[in-house]
């Protein structure tokens, strides 16, 4: 169960980032309300009005918009009985809690829209379909802006001539889980849901049981019920009026006759975006370590999991549902890729088209003989079939390279279909985190510091003398790097005094690496960098208030060349360039947050 106020993840730097995000996009009121909830915890509307010194009407107005986007969650209690209630009325006391996870998704809104545009911009056979991509991207963007929306309301606001195509796009996005239905429990804190389930299960257990046994059993039952409720959200039937979903070899097969439920309330699914982003990040790491050919093969392998996984936290295990064969990869990969061209029997390069025989005439070899066209066609068909097998063999060789890597990209689990492979995402992402952290250490402190960090990770706990032998460097130089690594939390030191006076000369210092602590500390630095980037964007825009207000005029939109002066065009170009650089930097920083926190 995830916690809204986990001390390892919810920090002052993250809270400051949430304020900056809301202030820049949703206004000062939203930032003040969420800031108060982050600082003081759950509060009622009256308590918020008191802590923020805002009118109660303004607090209610701001909370309505925040709850719609699930930036703020609520929990209702009956004032008389004090019990939890789902019926909100005059006798209800409603408490509000800030949901920093949804607030942070604002950073990724642009990336999610681009992912939708890229995925749906490809038609059958890999052909480009930009119209479909733009239409689906617009749907995703609108849902990200408004938080959630009923299908009937969205279609009603759509021009009549576009409704059929928009409805079809929504249905496809729902089938692929880029959109998911919103359920009532998603507007409530998980901690409160768990507490209510725990009390319900505890009250049903007999009092004859030991108190500790009753609490343990109630906790297990509550956790199971909460997980089951969350899993129901991933049901492929949700959002459709009728029809069933069959499964073949663990892969969902969707009934195209199903009708979209116009009363369903939908929202964008950030978990699907994380699955796609994780695949791309793993493929980039494979390219760095194993080459472009192996990385492209790995990218195709990972793409097979997109339809089988609904989130990065989903448990997987080797089996028919999550095993990928070399033949499956060979069907979608480009056979012209360097390193995959078949060699040997079955290859066109080795088995060329039969040459025409020259016929001897009275004047010499002047004419060419004919050959049987049917025989050549049969041979070419055999070559095509053999080339498919040879391609699968070449794919299998690249997968073996990935399986042999110490970064645990993939595991070999069988020989079916030219070779069966399974990606253990937990191990692969843990190796990804370690590799990216070492990369950051190298950027900041150099290769020697990275080498020392690797040595400590391999050996567990080591002292300076052992590190000197491993790194082949003098003690003084090693100590300087160790102190740098200790200052950023990459290494911790344990003191083992050999005497009671704890003298430094008689103390053994053991250096070790705690991965979770190191990743948490580096995440705080990244949050601070993201906050500064957003503040810098706001500061750059504040320098040109008149120009930006002019761009908002209806007569200027789309006619900038006509209404803007040369100086204004130059200022606008400079602003766009600075914004682009900052946005690229923010995207890279968010990529690191995904690696260290979300995968």
Swiss-Prot record:
Where it sits in the cell: the answer is:
Nucleus
Xref: Pfam families: HTH_9, POLR3C_WHD, RNA_pol_Rpc82
Gene Ontology annotations of biological process type = DNA-templated transcription
Disordered, as annotated region: 335-371
**What Gene3D superfamilies does the database record attribute to this sequence?**
Winged helix-like DNA-binding domain superfamily/Winged helix DNA-binding domain
Gene Ontology cellular-component annotations: RNA polymerase III complex
Gene Ontology molecular function terms on file: single-stranded DNA binding
Q: Which keywords does UniProt give here?
A: DNA-directed RNA polymerase, Nucleus, Transcription, Zinc
Q: Which InterPro entries match?
A: POLR3C_WHD, RNA_pol_III_RPC82-rel_HTH, RNA_pol_III_Rpc82_C, RPC3, WH-like_DNA-bd_sf
Record's family? Belongs to the RNA polymerase beta chain family.
- Please give the function described in this protein's UniProt entry: DNA-dependent RNA polymerase catalyzes the transcription of DNA into RNA using the four ribonucleoside triphosphates as substrates. Specific core component of RNA polymerase III which synthesizes small RNAs, such as 5S rRNA and tRNAs.
Give the multimer and partner information.
Component of the RNA polymerase III (Pol III) complex consisting of 17 subunits.
What name has this protein been given in UniProt?
DNA-directed RNA polymerase III subunit RPC3
What gene is this protein a product of? RPC82
